[in-house]
Structure formats: structure tokens, C-alpha cells
Amino acid sequence: MASVSSSPSYSSQAAVLLLLHQPPHQHGHGGACLRYRGSQSQGRGNAVATSLGLSAAGRGGAGGLLLLPPLPALRAAEGKDGRAVTKDEEEEAAAAAVEEEGEVEVRREEDKPGDDGSREAAARGSGSGRFSADYISLGIREPVYEVIEVKSNGRMSTKKISRRQLLKSSGLRLRDTRSVDPSLWLMNSMPSLLVREQAILVNLGSLRAIAMHERVLIFNYNSPGGKAFLDSLLPRLNPRNINGGPAMPFQLEVVEAALLSRIQRLERRLMRIEPRVGALLEVLPNRLTADVLEQLRLSKQALVELGSRAGDLKQMLIDLLDDPHEIRRICIMGRNCTLDKLSDNMECSVPLEKQIAEEEEEEIEMLLENYLQRCESIHGQAERLLDSAREMEDSIAVNLSSRRLEVSRVELLLQVGTFCVAIGALIAGIFGMNLKSYLETNAWAFWATTGGIVVGAVAGFFIMYSYLKTRKIL
């Protein structure tokens, strides 16, 4: 059985060896040789030589070599299905390999925030690397958040952090980040203060932040809530403002700054709306114009929004005060303390830390109660102004209804008068026809007819008016 092989060299010419029971032997020149043996092999060799156009002189003896001319190089590379790979397929495979290397390199660049990212990628193994390549090939990008990081010493920096790095550094779970994810602001508009083992998630309107033991990450820092929070937090972290007293834990400073900034924003909004509503309440009873009514509508809408936000914040603070477990979890954050699952008591390895945590628990309760009172005051004032605006709307509606009633009465009286006059016009029309009544020959007939029409119309009007008054229609 004969087979064909080729040498994997890149020269312009290659030797093709036909193997007949013996392995091929290279000859001195650039061609190939054929070894044959025996009579059967010799006959077979003669046939091959004749077909290739060689003379018998080039053949050896019984075991001689048959010289073959140089042939073009054949590709020895084979595909997975056993067929030879063409040049185009080899170029496509090389391009695919280069593209795959580029994708894996891009994935490594994204996943490498430092040495931690390299160690994490090495720990995941080859399977995770395959997942990363598929992650990019599908066009799916891991969410990357642009946040401001404020440390406990007051240093502030802007950074980009992926969701995986965020979960790893804060010890949170994926479902925990939904309350602070800026892309889900329509689904998590309710204010919340979630306490976890290593972080506190703050969601107060446009303010979204994650407070940890030594730093805080602020999302949407360009929003009004984020700017107000930074203006309230940074002065607290200045060592000159401590006045030598004991400093509060950093996470408590963050919580208080967040609540303070939110309450102050609500108070400023109330202070802008209250004078405007008061001025409208004084003007409206005597001046019912379209502009004044439109201002009343806008003010009422602003009061409804303010009352809703203050009410949601008040309910969040009430729920937090009703759950002492959450307050204790805030106190033990960053300390070697745990909470007993049965009695919910704090257990600390150092007695001093337990004493400090208990004192902080009382401070947190007083802090929350203080902001709860301010929030209730805002909510109550907004509700009172809203009630006044609604009462004014009811008064305006009654006033307009009374005016419409007066217009309807006048219109009815005019219709009655018109009816009575129409009867007189009917009589005049009858006499105005070209019929001979023989009254036109008498001078007194005109005055008698005119007086009768006027008296009849007036009498008919008073009769209809008394009837409508009796039926309480007028």
C-alpha cells in the first residue's frame, strides 16, 4: 500500500517519497528517490518510472533507487476531519487566534485594578478565563460605576469601580446593591438605610452612598443630593472642627451627614413654598384670574411632592427606631463584637468596646429621634399648607358655582321676558297682515292695540315670575 508524505520545510521545492515496503532515503540532489526490491517490486518500479518519463539507466539493481524529479511542495497540515487545510483556512485560523488573544488581553486589563485583580484572576483558574473570553465575545460588559471615595481623614478622590470589585471590597451581596444602583433609580425611589456587616447602604432621594468603616463611596455625586451631602460631610472630617472631643465613628458621621443634608433640603424647599402659598391665599378670594389659579395649582403640586418625600423619610426613621437590632448592628460595625441571635445582646471580646457600643446606641437613638422630629415638623407644615390650598380650592369652586347660579337666574328672567314680548309681536303680526279688519279706519284702534300688547306682556311676565318663585326655580 502506497502513501504520500512531505517534509515540513519552507523551501521552494520539496521531495516526495513513495514508500514501497521500505522507508524513504534522501538522495544527494533536490529530487526524491524510490527504493524497490524483488521482481514484483521491480516491475512496479518500472511502471512508475515509465509513467514519470525516466529512462531505465537511472534505475539500480534489485534493490536500487529510482530518482524522481522535484515536485511542488504539498501541504501536510490536516484539519480535524482529516482533510488538508487550505491557505485561506490557515489565514482565518491565525486571525481568529490573534483576535482571541486580544480579547483575553482586554479582559485582563479590565479585571486588573492592581495586584488584587491579578491574584483573583489566577485563583479562578482556566475555567474562569474561558468565561471572561465568552463574556466579551457576547458583547456583555460588567457594570462600572464612577464614584467619589471619601476617606475618614477627609481625602477625596474620583475612581471607577466595577460591580465585582465593589462587592468584594464592601462584603455585600448582589441583591444589596440594588438600593444604591443609579441605573435602578425608578425602582428604588423609596428612602432606605440598610445595615450590613461591613457597610451601610444609604438611599435618600438623589443621594446614593455606601458607608464603610474607613471610607464612603458616593454615586451620582453631581446630583443635588450628592453635592449637599459632600458639603455636609467634609467639614465634619476636618480635624479642626473636632474641638478636642471624642470623635464619632466614621459610619455614624456619614449617616448623620446624609440625614442632615436631606432634612435641610426639605426645609429649604418648604421655606420657598410657604410664602408663595400664603400670598396666594390672601389674593384669591378677591382676584380670580387664570394666572393666579395656575400658581395655586403649581404650589399645590409642590406641596404634595414635599409632603410625600417628608412622609417617606419619616416612615423610614420610625421603622429604624422600632428595630433596635439594626441600631446595634451599626454600633458593632468595625469592632470585635457580635450579636446574640436569641437575646440580641452585644458580646464583645473587649469590655471597653461593649461599653462604647452601648453609649453609641443611645446616641444613635437620640440622633434619629431628633431628625424624626424635624421631619415630622416639615411633613406637618406641608400638610397644613396643602389643606389650606385645598380649602381655598373648595371656596373658589363654591364661589364659581354661586356666580354660575346668578348667571343662570338672569338668563331665565330674560327668557321669560322674551317669551312675553314674543306674544305681543304675534298680535302685531296678525294685525299687520293684508286683511281687512276695518280697524284701520279708526284712529283709536292703533293706541288700543298697542296698549293691549304692552299690558298683556307685562302681566304675562309677572305671572311667569310668580310661578317660578312658587316652584323655587328662581
Curated annotation (Swiss-Prot):
Gene Ontology molecular functions: magnesium ion transmembrane transporter activity
Q: Tell me which domain of life the UniProt entry assigns to the organism this sequence originates from.
A: Eukaryota
Localization of this protein: Plastid; Plastid, Chloroplast membrane
Single biological process term from Gene Ontology: thylakoid membrane organization
Transit peptide segment = 1-55
Entry's Gene Ontology cellular component terms: chloroplast envelope; chloroplast membrane
| Residue ranges of the region described as Disordered | 79-129
Q: Which PANTHER family match?
A: MAGNESIUM TRANSPORTER MRS2 HOMOLOG, MITOCHONDRIAL, RNA SPLICING PROTEIN MRS2, MITOCHONDRIAL
Write out the function statement from the record: Magnesium transporter that may mediate the influx of magnesium in chloroplast.
What is the official name of this protein in its record? Magnesium transporter MRS2-A, chloroplastic
